[in-house]
C-alpha cells in the first residue's frame, strides 16, 4: 500500500527551472511560458485508490 499523501500540495518555487529547460534544449519562448505556470496538486486516498488532480491556471487534470 502506498504512503498516504492526502492533501493539497501548493507549488512553491522554480529554482533553476530555466537552466533545466535550457539543458533539455527548449526554445526561449517555451521556457518563458513554462516559467509562468504554477501547478498545484490535490491528492485523495480512498482505500486502495488514489486520485491526483493537477490544478493550473489554464487547465486542470485528474489521474
UniProtKB/Swiss-Prot annotation:
SUPFAM superfamilies: Lipocalins
GO molecular function: retinal binding; retinol binding
Record keywords: Retinol-binding, Transport, Vitamin A
Superkingdom of the organism of origin: Eukaryota
Key word RNA-binding present: no
Coiled coil: none
Domain notes: Forms a beta-barrel structure that accommodates hydrophobic ligands in its interior.
Function (record text): Binds vitamin A2 in the eye lens and thus functions as a UV filter. Intracellular transport of retinol.
Family to which the UniProt record says this protein belongs: Belongs to the calycin superfamily. Fatty-acid binding protein (FABP) family.
PANTHER family: FATTY ACID BINDING PROTEIN
Protein name per the record: Iota-crystallin
